[in-house]
């Protein structure tokens, strides 16, 4: 009986959050180990289904860097990263398109639809479809890194129509310049940020392989305000790959996204814990 009561109390704790977030838009960037391990993949799909069943509108943007690297290695194509961004020649772009749009996007859609069988399910898109992600060429610190795109505009009309019809858009980050018809590989974090900003999302959630932003003792910093992050970078608390994520988070907050969350996708149900409990499990960034 005590265990049953405990479960009831957990549901009761979630009620204020469910009420507050009903009908709101969450943009989730899906990547890392959560995309690679079977148990984590299925756990993630169930979590997204639960968000949908309690009335939250979810837009999913996925990465796939490890799968792209594995395919490039199989094809004996060398790959190089410049400050976390893949240098993308024509061959690498073709592989990225094949892996992101042809394989991963459809795998994710089918996995989500299995868990949302009695409602409008997931629908797979890329940034090419209906000019969803219109891009210009991206330069990394002034360096030409090939066919890498920076999102210029988002077709929010299409996304809004889909979520109003209760579909869950699943977006592969391949964008296009419609004037030149040139396709571009887009960093998934950057794509998710632009989509969240242009939708005015309630939340932007990054799934990573770490427990959010850590202090120098290795403990998770549960919340960061926009006026704190520069100091955390300057004193070496935030380093390496977390710097572009925190920069994206601050950009999103300043452009109208209410809160950004950086959580560990290797922990089962981390999204539910972060969204529906007072304590959370990762780092929350806000004004």
Curated annotation (Swiss-Prot):
It is found in: Cytoplasm. Substrate binds at residues 64-65, 86, 185. The keyword ATP-binding applies. GO terms for cellular component: cytoplasm. Its EC number is 2.7.2.8. It catalyses: N-acetyl-L-glutamate + ATP = N-acetyl-L-glutamyl 5-phosphate + ADP. The keyword Amino-acid biosynthesis applies. Pathway: Amino-acid biosynthesis; L-arginine biosynthesis; N(2)-acetyl-L-ornithine from L-glutamate: step 2/4. InterPro entries: AceGlu_kinase-like_sf, AcgluKinase_fam, ArgB, Asp/Glu/Uridylate_kinase, Glu/AcGlu_kinase, NAGK-C. GO terms for molecular function: acetylglutamate kinase activity; ATP binding. It comes from the Bacteria. One of its GO terms (biological process) is arginine biosynthetic process via ornithine. CDD domains: AAK_NAGK-C (cd04250). Catalyzes the ATP-dependent phosphorylation of N-acetyl-L-glutamate. This is Acetylglutamate kinase. It comes from Hydrogenobaculum sp. (strain Y04AAS1).
């Amino acid at each position: 009986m005590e265990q049953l009561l405990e479960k009831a109390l957990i549901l009761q704790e979630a009620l204020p959050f469910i009420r507050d977030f009903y009908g709101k838009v969450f943009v989730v960037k899906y990547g890392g180990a959560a995309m690679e391990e079977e148990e984590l993949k299925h756990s993630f799909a169930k979590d997204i289904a639960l968000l949908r069943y309690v009335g939250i509108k979810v837009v999913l943007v996925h990465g796939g860097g490890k799968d792209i690297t594995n395919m490039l290695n199989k094809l004996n194509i060398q790959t190089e990263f410049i400050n976390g961004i893949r240098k993308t020649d024509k061959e690498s772009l073709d592989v990225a398109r094949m892996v992101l749009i042809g394989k991963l996007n459809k795998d994710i859609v089918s996995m989500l639809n299995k868990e949302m069988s009695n409602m409008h399910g997931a629908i797979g898109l890329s940034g090419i479809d209906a000019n969803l992600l219109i891009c210009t060429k991206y330069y990394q610190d002034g360096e030409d890194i090939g066919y890498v795109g920076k999102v210029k505009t988002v077709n929010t009309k299409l996304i809004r129509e889909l979520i109003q019809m209760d579909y869950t858009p699943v977006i592969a980050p391949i964008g296009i310049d419609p004037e030149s018809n040139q396709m571009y590989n887009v960093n998934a974090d950057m794509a998710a940020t632009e989509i969240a900003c242009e939708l005015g999302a309630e939340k932007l959630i990054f799934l990573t392989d770490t427990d959010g932003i850590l202090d120098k003792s290795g403990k998770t910093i549960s919340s960061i305000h926009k006026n704190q992050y520069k100091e955390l970078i300057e004193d070496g608390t935030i380093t390496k790959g977390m710097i572009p994520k925190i920069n994206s988070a601050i950009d999103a907050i300043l452009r109208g996204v209410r809160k950004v969350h950086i959580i560990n996708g290797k922990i089962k149900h981390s999204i539910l814990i972060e969204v529906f409990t007072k304590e959370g499990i990762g780092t929350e960034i806000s004004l």
